[in-house]
Regions:
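N-terminal secretory signal peptides
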Residues: 1-11, 37-39
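N-terminal export leaders
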Residues: 11-19, 28
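Conserved N-terminal/central alpha/beta ligand/cofactor-binding core
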Residues: 18, 50, 82, 89-204, ...
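Glycine- and aromatic-enriched mobile tails/lids
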Residues: 22, 43-52, 57-59, 73, ...
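Core beta-strand elements of the Rossmann-like FAD/NAD(P) dinucleotide-binding domain
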Residues: 57-59, 203-212, 382
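N-terminal Rossmann-like FAD-binding beta1-loop-alpha1 element of flavoenzymes
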Residues: 61-85
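Glycine-rich loop(s) and the adjacent beta-strand/alpha-helix scaffold that form part
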Residues: 212-264, 402-422
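C-terminal catalytic lobe of FAD-dependent flavoproteins
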Residues: 299-372, 383, 390
Length: 579
């Protein structure tokens, strides 16, 4: 991007556009804000906004996301008779957490030693009641069929998924739009009407009109180091929140560790997960990857040597997260439990050697425990026509702790198919919605606003500031009200002042602006839900409320945007659907 240090690279038009901001920058320097370091600076776009083009596409059903859930949502919606489009911020099968997931669970009644009922009961006991047994059963019941279809497409023959994902897509001649950043879900007359965003490869705004939308956008975090989620920022969840969808699961935490050596090098810690072919896992219910290690590190202030998940540390530490004794294990964990080399390469098995480092997946909850609130077993949200699947759906399939290895990928496949069939049925009963010209203009202005801003905050700097607020162990993992409220004050400042002033100079930075904004809203959700849940359970631990409270907190927390624009929180009792 051109800078003020290279005046010959600046046209007269661009110079005039930013000249008014220069005086402001001088004042900012007096306040200790340095444009040189990117906090706040003049914006000199590389893009001629006046030459941005516009494209509109239409289909019965729009699938957003190119991972496992998106694949099955697209294929099954087509097979159910809908005209389908798939749009992805990345590449089909190569973005989000799907490329990293190498274990997929299959419940095979012919070989499994326990019944389906027993499996669901085991998951419920491990999850301490936080799972939705309807979605637990649904995942197990349909997992084998989805695994068999993946086998037909060549899924288990390569560590890379793009080719096998493309096989059923190309056979059905389904339209796929890759490297499109969706920034807005569009609602008209109380129901979903489509989505809009921009291309990362050309100066073009895209509007997609559809009768129904299935969000397969995954979960997200705060772009932490050491775990492969840096392209996931809760985009789908936050877009849906802005149009009135209910969101759940923000107080829970994913406990995947990184490694202390080269902590920011994701491939160093998890490379074997990307390089090996996927496999099938069988029934083995765990209670893993909560915040046990975070608590141990907090209490001892020492590096914690990695042990087998489910096994208490040798040194007795008083208090901490409750683990059902039934799920304390003595055997080695499944291979995808921790970042280590494959034993065949001479390294220790995952989770059994080295020094772990926390915060590697900061901002993400347990798989399937956060996202849009389903109003039924069909992955349907409270917005007519809007569905979600996989990590974008707060189905509580496994509860608020990791229970069954491989069920995350299986759940994405199963829910993608379930959502597709329900959405296709919905499409048959409605007409194609009209999107008003006023709405089109409003969305386009919001997309282009960061490029038009004469000066503002760098999204990279705001992201780093947010990480400094949210990722400390004593904020997001080991919680107490005073610190949660202190962090919330900072996040609300970012929301109210810095977020409206984010600027972008090119398409890459424009993507970062929207991702940063989504992370700020997600941080607010996490802090407010963590303050509201006054107990400790599974992957949520409060120092000031260290015990489980079954009298008051056998409930999930749902979040929605009020009519005044403020964030509203409510309880939804376990074993119930939202009202």
């Amino acid at each position: 991007m051109a800078t003020l240090q290279n005046p010959k690279d600046i046209s007269r038009r661009k110079f005039m556009a930013v000249a008014g901001g220069v005086a402001g920058l001088a004042a900012m320097a007096a306040m200790g804000i340095s444009a040189e370091h990117g906090e706040c600076s003049a914006n000199i776009p590389e893009i001629d906004i006046d030459n941005m083009t516009y494209a509109e596409s239409e289909a019965d059903l729009l699938v957003i996301g190119g991972g496992m859930a998106g694949l099955f949502a697209t294929v099954k919606a087509h097979d159910a008779g809908s005209k389908v489009m798939l749009v992805s911020k990345g590449r089909l099968g190569s973005s989000g957490q799907t490329p990293f997931a190498k274990g997929i669970f299959a419940f095979d009644p012919s070989s499994t030693k326990i019944s389906l009922d027993d499996f669901v009961d085991q998951v419920s006991r491990s999850a301490l009641g936080t799972n939705n047994p309807v979605y637990t059963r649904q995942m197990a019941e349909h997992s084998l069929a989805r695994v068999n279809e993946l086998r037909e497409w060549g899924f288990f023959e390569s560590p890379l998924y793009n080719n096998c994902f493309n096989k059923p897509i190309k056979e059905r001649n389904i339209s796929v739009y890759e490297r499109i950043v969706i920034t807005h879900l569009i609602k008209e007359d109380g129901r979903i009407a489509g989505a809009a965003g921009f291309s990362l490869d050309e100066e073009k705004i895209h509007v997609f009109r559809a009768k129904s939308v299935i969000l397969c956008t995954g979960a997200g975090g705060f772009k932490p180091n050491g775990f492969p989620i840096c392209d996931l920022t809760h985009d789908g969840t936050v877009m849906a929140y802005h149009i009135g969808a209910k969101v759940t699961g923000k107080e829970w935490n994913d406990g995947h560790p990184g490694q202390a050596t080269n902590a920011a090098a994701c491939f160093d810690g998890w490379g074997n997960m990307f390089e090996r072919k996927p496999g099938v896992t069988s029934v083995e219910v765990h209670h893993d990857l909560g915040v046990d290690l975070n608590y141990a590190a907090y209490m001892t202030a020492n590096p914690i040597r990695m042990g087998r998940p489910g096994i208490r540390l040798q040194k007795k530490i008083e208090g901490g997260p409750f683990r059902p004794a039934e799920f304390n294990r003595s055997g080695p964990p499944e291979r995808e439990q921790g970042p280590r080399k494959d034993p065949r390469e001479g390294g220790a098995p995952p989770g059994m050697g080295g020094t772990p480092v926390g915060g590697s997946s900061a901002g993400m909850s347990i798989h399937k425990s956060e996202g849009l609130v389903p109003i039924n077993e069909k992955c349907e949200s409270n917005i007519p026509g809007l569905y979600a699947a996989g990590d974008a759906l707060g189905s509580y399939m496994a509860g608020a702790i990791y229970t069954q290895v491989g069920s995350s990928l299986a759940g994405s496949a199963v829910q993608g198919a379930v959502a597709a069939e329900a959405a296709a049925e919905y499409c048959r009963g409605v007409e194609m919605p009209e999107i008003s010209e006023a709405k089109m203009n409003e969305v386009q202005e919001e997309i282009l606003a960061p490029l038009k801003r004469e000066a503002g905050y760098s999204p990279a700097w705001v992201t780093q500031t947010l990480q400094g607020i949210m990722i400390p162990n004593f904020i997001i993992y080991i919680k107490k009200e005073s610190l949660l409220k202190a962090a919330l004050a900072y996040v609300e400042e970012l929301r109210d002042h810095h977020m409206p002033m984010l600027r972008a100079g090119d398409l890459h930075e424009l993507r970062l602006v929207f991702e940063t904004s989504n992370m700020i809203i997600s941080a607010e959700m996490k802090l407010k839900a963590s303050i509201m849940r006054k107990e400790s359970r599974c992957s949520h631990f409060r120092l000031d409320y260290p015990d489980m409270d079954t009298k008051n907190w056998n409930a999930w927390i749902n979040i929605c945007k009020g009519s005044d624009g403020s964030m509203k929180l409510e309880k939804q009792p376990f074993d119930s659907w939202p009202t």
